[in-house]
């Protein structure tokens, strides 16, 4: 917890948001949430790890819900072992959506279970996150965190980078 508090102090001095990884304790998920404020990001928000899953403890779920409503941004941060279908499905069914969807892609997660951002997006669709919210969570939402202006990004003469997806129902 001391490291998280120190990080928060530095983030305040630099006037930047802080991003914190939650998973195995220490620090506990609730302790991290209590330190974060509006604009800060907690990643691995839907992990299923013992002692750190928002679905293990109703108080922790309520705290995550309250913090999200106050501006703490929940990020998927899938990674190699930090995404639980069960937790994501239950949280989304209760109305708690992630602010952003990220892969946490690294050498141990690239070939399984993350694969790529499109696969991670598909996982969120499969557990009930609405399509428009999924698209926002990989475009405007993360851009907002780093204060990237998204106005007129697709306009005549502007440099654009986009992907076209084919949405297919499947198991």
Where are these regions (language model features)?
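Active-site core of metal-dependent hydrolases
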Residues: 1-111
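Short, Lys/Arg- and Gly-enriched loop/turn segments at beta-strand edges
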Residues: 169-171
């Amino acid at each position: 917890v001391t490291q998280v508090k120190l990080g928060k102090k530095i983030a305040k001095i630099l006037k930047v948001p802080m991003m914190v990884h939650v998973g195995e304790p220490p620090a506990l998920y609730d302790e991290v949430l209590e330190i974060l404020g509006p604009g800060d990001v907690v990643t691995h928000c839907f992990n299923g790890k013992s002692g750190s899953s928002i679905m293990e403890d109703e108080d922790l779920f309520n705290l995550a819900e309250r913090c999200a409503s106050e501006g703490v941004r929940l990020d998927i941060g899938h990674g190699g072992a930090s995404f639980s279908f069960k937790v994501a499905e239950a949280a989304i069914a209760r109305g708690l959506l992630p602010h952003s969807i990220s892969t946490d892609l690294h050498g141990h997660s690239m070939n399984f279970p993350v694969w790529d951002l499109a696969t991670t997006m598909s996982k969120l669709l499969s557990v009930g996150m609405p399509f428009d919210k999924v698209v926002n969570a990989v475009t405007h939402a993360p851009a907002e965190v780093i204060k990237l202006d998204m106005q007129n990004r697709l306009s005549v003469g502007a440099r654009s980078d986009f992907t076209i997806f084919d949405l297919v129902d499947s198991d």
